[in-house]
Structure formats: structure tokens, C-alpha cells
A protein has these predicted regions:
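Short, flexible helix-loop junctions that flank or precede catalytic/ligand sites
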Residues: 1-116
């Protein structure tokens, strides 16, 4: 996702904690919450963004997950088992970056698949 320009970003009071929580339901975002919005300056060529960052989803394959794959590779069951094993979806990783003030909700929504 694109990273907000640190020179010109402005605090975004319009993006509420509830709006961010809605895109990552049933997970919750704890801790600080500093949403910013892009503005544009000479440094970022009037885009409001400077650089990019990766969002990552890591799956540790447990014995239970291996059993799900071997017995009946049902996609829904595999997703549920992955979440039980501690996998965090891409959208949740993006929401954490929004809470840190590094990118915007719109960037995360455009770059990540919806939660099922």
C-alpha cells in the first residue's frame, strides 16, 4: 500500500475508530489510534503519498491444519483453522498500519480482499 507523506499528512478526524473497526470485524484494534489523510506537497509531488509498504499474512502450518488439508480440503474449513492457529488476514495488517498513521483506510480497502 502507499505510505502517507510525513511532510504534509494531516490528522483525519473524519475517520473514526468505529469505521476502522468495521472493516476488520470480528477482530479488534487495541492501542493508539492516529488516522491521517493525504494532503500533497512538493516532496510527494502533490499526491500525499511517499513510498510503499508491504502488508503480510503469515500462516504457520500446524498439525490440525495439515489434518484439514489431508482429510477434506474445504476452503472455508482451512480459513477457520488458519485463524484458530493465529493467522491475521491482510486487511487486519492494513488496519494496524492505519492506526499507526502510516496509510489510509481507502488504501487498505483497495489493496486487500474482503474478510469472509
Amino acid at each position: 500500500v502507499r505510505t502517507l507523506c510525513k511532510q504534509c499528512r494531516q490528522k483525519d478526524d473524519a475517520t473514526s475508530r468505529e469505521a476502522l473497526a468495521a472493516i476488520v470485524k470480528p477482530w479488534k484494534i487495541n492501542g493508539g489510534y492516529r488516522p491521517y489523510k493525504p494532503v500533497g506537497c512538493i516532496d510527494c509531488r502533490m499526491t500525499g503519498f511517499m513510498g510503499r509498504m508491504g502488508l503480510y499474512e503469515l500462516l504457520t502450518v500446524s498439525d490440525a491444519f495439515k489434518g484439514q488439508v489431508t482429510l477434506a480440503p474445504d476452503l472455508g474449513a482451512l480459513k477457520r483453522q488458519a485463524v484458530q492457529d493465529g493467522m491475521r488476514p491482510l486487511r487486519l495488517a492494513g488496519a494496524l498500519r492505519v492506526a499507526e498513521g502510516l496509510t489510509t483506510v481507502e488504501e487498505v480497502l483497495s489493496a486487500t480482499p474482503p474478510l469472509d
